[in-house]
Amino acid sequence: MLKKTLTNFITPSDPPHVHYAAHLAYITSLSGTTDSEESGPYSPSNASLRALGAIRDLHSLATRNSHTEVALFALVLELRDLVHNGVWNRVGESLLNVEKELKLTAEFDPAKPPTTIGTSNLEKVLVVHVLIIGVLYYTHTGDYANSQPRIKKLHDMLDGAALDAFGPSGIIDIHLPNSPPLTVQVTHPRIIFTLGFLVSSVSKRDPVGRKPKRKLFAQEGVLIVDKELKKEFPCKSRFNFL
């Protein structure tokens, strides 16, 4: 139904935010149709392949329109989709590409001068998501040398008020020239805060010792989860894309 809407009802005269919202709704519908009971080694389902194709269509549209932030959003959606579906042999290349586009590469190279990253709220949000995925990927592959600079940068950003970019509930606007903004729901900031502790716990190498950091981060993360489970917060799922 959503595919027909994209093909037959969305016209070139419609404003950009309408086009992008329709694409994102279609991507979300495809992402939610993956067989959750599938077990064993990864094999791409028709739904996941269609979702990946739909994400790339969104990226192509945003690139043609010179809407850089929407294109960046699509790149991070693709990276997230690959991780979600366990396509680890393609995550590395996608991660490096996204990090380059977000100007994160220089942050992990001591020989290069630091650059300004996350100049807008959306970019800060995307950087935080990409850092979390990067830590998980390099921990998964056993690459401690690449995992640690990313966890350090993640800590720096979370300690430096990067969560403010998420707003009170993770609803942010992607501003478009001469058009109303595209409103999307990203991960709730309280969930990001909790993930910061839990991701840190799995990325540390010191599971034993007098004060093992892995244990400290894990304990703090679990305590936060317990507290958050007792609270309620609004989440408008109709905007939920990342």
Mark where each language-model region is.
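Extended alpha-helical scaffold regions
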Residues: 1-242
